[in-house]
């Protein structure tokens, strides 16, 4: 099983690499595995909720400092009130989109946002890791069932066609 301290440090390291675009070479093998899982989940969340995230980032373009402070406060209050791993992954996705918009213009604000939110997200890193592992098990099981169903269907189809063409 995972140790709580190591998982918190692991999540913190992975999030810093993911959000600050550092090289993945600094991560251990286990952290790279977690990085890949978090990146895949965050990309899926970005794809699924791209319209909502785009509306937030369009608002940010008008008055950057004011809206970033508001978004920062809202994300922190949501993370403190609801500590589910899915909420944390959605916050990471939103944060990565905001940083994509801001990284060229205002690095100080991006760093301010990153440090506070990463500390809150990584407090219970074990739950994020367990959530990602459970999601992978669910996906693997679903793919295996689908593969088995397709195999059985193809065998039945083969013998049905063989019988029909023989007559």
From Swiss-Prot:
Name of one Pfam family that matches: M11L
Q: Name one GO biological process term.
A: regulation of apoptotic process
**Lineage: superkingdom:** Viruses
Protein name according to UniProt: Uncharacterized protein C10
Organism (species): Swinepox virus (strain Kasza) (SWPV)
Q: What is the lineage of its organism?
A: Viruses, Varidnaviria, Bamfordvirae, Nucleocytoviricota, Pokkesviricetes
């Amino acid at each position: 099983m995972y140790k709580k301290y190591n998982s918190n440090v692991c999540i913190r390291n992975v999030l810093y690499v993911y959000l600050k675009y550092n090289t993945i070479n600094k991560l251990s093998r286990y952290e790279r595995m977690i990085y890949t899982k978090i990146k895949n989940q965050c990309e899926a969340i970005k794809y699924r909720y791209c319209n909502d995230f785009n509306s937030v980032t369009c608002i940010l373009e008008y008055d950057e400092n004011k809206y970033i402070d508001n978004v920062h406060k809202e994300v922190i209050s949501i993370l403190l009130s609801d500590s589910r791993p899915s909420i944390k992954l959605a916050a990471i996705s939103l944060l990565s989109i905001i940083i994509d918009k801001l990284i060229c213009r205002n690095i100080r604000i991006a760093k301010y946002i990153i440090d506070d939110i990463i500390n809150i997200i990584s407090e219970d890193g074990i739950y994020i890791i367990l959530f990602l592992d459970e999601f992978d098990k669910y996906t693997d099981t679903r793919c295996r069932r689908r593969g088995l169903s397709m195999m059985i269907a193809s065998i039945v189809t083969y013998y049905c066609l063989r019988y029909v063409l023989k007559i």
